[in-house]
């Protein structure tokens, strides 16, 4: 374990001082011994304290650590960020630029991870898609740059495409939710990602496509590889009960933009599946006839594809990573080959990764949700009725890991809806659900929790394991319409090599690489670190 005086960075007990002394303390994730951080944490903590003392012009800054809020950084704040970076990098003798020699600091992935969620995103693995030096400085800058106009436009276009594919669910329980306690609201929010994933799977099997599809994987820091089905269950890391930093493993997650069947036959409508309780296999056999293609969507203000070599290479590796993550969750081994494994093993793999992801996000996966929260989820998301029925009436859910876990739990985990008045929900439940919900108002065989619903989500992955295509696509959009498509053959060996290189950077085993000199005029003008970047000013000085 780290010494008491140097525990501050990993524990992230952050005191935020803005607007005349506003202070907030955050609970800390556990630490599983990070000896490589011991010499550097005091320096880094001093840097954090200095940075968080600078004033802000925006009086609506949320009561959260500055480094994780997305408010616009004015020039004065940018100067403060850069000034403190100079101090952190011990650059006084190099002024006005950052030191040429990389200081001994916590590795970039630790510095960049959110305090309550010790994990990284897929995009953080794309360290040099723009400039790796910028990625490096961003990790330690303790504040994110304000999104550009292009980024805001891209977010809006992605949201529009998502809503076009997946009809936004209507909240029919607003009046009921007005009486929710803060705990009940937190429970409902913690289920959002899980409910979206279920919805995406059902839409994939009913309309042949899904957008914003959650994926997750675990990186072995020693081998620089992703963990596959053959090694996953051996890791103590996946059996933790709370967020932690780990010497050996890093959790990575992201959202795949678009998953689409290349040969789709109009199958069952989502509503009919709800009414008739069709099985997942029925949906698959009815609608999905061809391979499922992983697609990444890039949005543009004008119908022009970038010519930047680094950006294009980054796009190709990004779509490869999404394909890799989804393949691993569906039973492929790290070489990208379908392993001779059983449906149960695929269930267990997906279940383990999803539970670990929820834990690293700080969620209590075993906390039974309030019964009223469960019914609100059903009213707003009627397509989960089949899953709720299984949790209610079945002794076994068909996932050996979950069934074994539940058998070892005490009766404190029971869940009872018999005390809830069903009439309170009759006005907001769809007619097709009214009769089926009657059996839910009793004592359930299993509690409704993130863990139990995840055990049922894992059943979707064997359905797609043999249907993932080796072809991937990048689709470029402007104003909601695709104007160009690039096709790439999935190359798992190349992705493994890419992963090895990027993980070395993220864990501090190699220094960042600057961009090509020829790219400096095009890229450095958009970087908030240009004024203190020695490399940029050496070849293109700021005047």
From Swiss-Prot:
Its cofactor is Mg(2+); [4Fe-4S] cluster. The keyword Magnesium applies. This is Exonuclease V, mitochondrial. Pfam families: Exo5. Its EC number is 3.1.-.-. InterPro entries: EXOV. GO terms for molecular function: 4 iron, 4 sulfur cluster binding; DNA binding; metal ion binding; single-stranded DNA 5'-3' DNA exonuclease activity. Belongs to the EXO5 family. Binds 1 [4Fe-4S] cluster. The gene is EXO5. One of its GO terms (cellular component) is mitochondrion. It is found in: Mitochondrion. [4Fe-4S] cluster binds at residues 131, 524, 527, 533. Keywords: 4Fe-4S, DNA-binding, Exonuclease, Hydrolase, Iron, Iron-sulfur, Magnesium, Metal-binding, Mitochondrion, Nuclease, Transit peptide. Monomer.
